[in-house]
């Protein structure tokens, strides 16, 4: 549904990490961290990233031992745990545990920045909306992180309607990002909005037409590089509507595309892996 964006999320987490640690790192260390994120984004071997990322996760946990009051560090650690759980952890129990840890970290950062939002799951959509009206461009990294981590937590509990009931709150966070800074992360808010709006069929409250438009907008704002948007459209629109021609057309286009694009290579390789799996299972599904 909403995961598989590890490369982009790692880059975003590194920006948060550098902001939090500006007084702790030398210029050389900051440069190395940026270069590490760039290397990951442009890596075309997801398995290599899968094997290397745990060291980065452990480093973030170590930094939080003495700096748990720094929202940027909490957000960076939350992003990494969530993205790794969604993209690389096959054991559902372990993935759920990592996503729960990530959500706790994200909510802790939200509480530090905005004490009135310490328990967002307990607020109604109207209460949450009212509490976010004062937020501005400086809050976009916070909103994006809480939204993506929360979405990842829901994704791993898709069979739990109590978890799925949180989707309107996640949508509200992403909509607020679009209102403040629509080009954040090259259209990422539209990717998440589209994934949320196409998750359910119209009969159950889904917004298929709106979701398709949002996924198309995500592709447009990425200059055509975002292959994951097409995978989501195939999985959540074409399959829901039992539209085999649309399904195969989208996925074959993803598989045939050159995944190599600066800042998009890893995510596109993950999208192609997912596209191949969906194509392989298509005969059984349809």
Q: Where is each model-derived feature located?
A:
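Bacterial N-terminal signal peptides that target proteins for export
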Residues: 1-10
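N-terminal alpha-helical interaction modules that lie
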Residues: 22-187, 200, 221-224, 239-286
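Short conserved catalytic/interaction loops centered on acidic-Pro-aromatic/His motifs
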Residues: 206-207, 225-231, 244
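C-terminal motif of bacterial Sec signal peptides marking the signal peptidase cleavage site
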Residues: 17-20
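Alpha-helical protein-protein interaction modules
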Residues: 212, 231, 235-240, 244
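Alpha-helical adaptor scaffolds
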Residues: 182-223
């Amino acid at each position: 549904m909403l995961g598989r964006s590890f490369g982009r999320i790692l880059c975003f987490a590194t920006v948060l990490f550098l902001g939090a640690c500006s007084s702790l790192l030398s210029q050389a260390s900051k440069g190395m961290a940026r270069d590490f994120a760039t290397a990951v984004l442009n890596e075309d071997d997801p398995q290599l990233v899968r094997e290397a990322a745990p060291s980065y996760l452990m480093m973030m946990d170590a930094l939080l031992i003495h700096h748990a009051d720094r929202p940027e560090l909490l957000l960076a650690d939350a992003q990494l745990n969530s993205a790794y759980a969604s993209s690389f952890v096959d054991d559902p129990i372990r993935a759920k545990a990592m996503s729960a840890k990530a959500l706790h970290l994200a909510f802790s950062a939200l509480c530090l920045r905005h004490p009135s939002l310490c328990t967002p799951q307990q607020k109604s959509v109207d209460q949450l909306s009212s509490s976010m009206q004062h937020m501005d461009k400086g809050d976009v990294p916070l909103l994006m992180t809480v939204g993506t981590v929360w979405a990842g937590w829901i994704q791993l509990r898709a069979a739990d309607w109590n978890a799925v009931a949180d989707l309107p709150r996640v949508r509200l966070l992403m909509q607020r990002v679009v209102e403040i800074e629509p080009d954040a992360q090259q259209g990422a808010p539209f990717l998440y909005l589209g994934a949320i709006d196409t998750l359910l069929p119209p009969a159950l409250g889904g917004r298929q037409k709106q979701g398709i438009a949002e996924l198309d907008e995500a592709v447009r704002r990425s200059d055509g590089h975002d292959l994951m948007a097409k995978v989501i459209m195939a999985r959540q629109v074409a399959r829901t509507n039992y539209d085999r021609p649309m399904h195969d057309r989208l996925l074959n286009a993803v598989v045939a595309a050159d995944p190599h694009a600066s800042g998009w290579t890893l995510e596109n390789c993950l999208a192609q892996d997912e596209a191949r799996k969906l194509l392989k299972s298509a005969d059984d599904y349809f």
